Amino acid sequence: MISFFRAFFLIIIISFLIFVGAQARTLLGNYHDDEMLIELKLESGNYGRTPYKTPPPPTSSSPTHQEIVNGRHDSVLPPPSPKTDPIIGQLTTITTTPHHDDTVAAPPVGGRHDYVASPPPPKPQDEQRQIIITSSSSTLPLQASY
């Protein structure tokens, strides 16, 4: 039984050495084949194929930094309109009704799911109240008065 394991072990070692030798030959062979391949390329030209010609680069100038950021446009775009700064301390008046504050969104139970219910009709004018929201440049939260 021990002789069987020794024979098996020797076969594995011999196979490994053959494998390493073949790899070494392949690596050395590829090195020499590259030199021969260069000689063949010089002798045979382009192997019967016509080489692919790349198209010439566009004749337009290279893009500027601004064109890279914004992208090139065939027509010149007008400059963007100036933005107005918000007025600090501006008062905004919002009119709401009390029943809108109490509404809760509930998912539909059945039937059409794409139907959105309209808000309830407003109550008479005397029950409405005004909310005034003031804002400032400070980091304090917005204040609301009823």
Swiss-Prot record:
Residues 25-48, 67-70, 86-110, 131-146 form a propeptide. GO terms for biological process: defense response. Residues 1-24 form the signal peptide. Residues 47-128 are annotated as: Disordered. Keywords: Glycoprotein, Hormone, Hydroxylation, Plant defense, Secreted, Signal. The modification 4-hydroxyproline is found at P51, P55, P56, P57, P58, P63, P79, P80, P82, P119, P120, P121, P122. It is found in: Secreted. Leaves. This is Hydroxyproline-rich systemin.
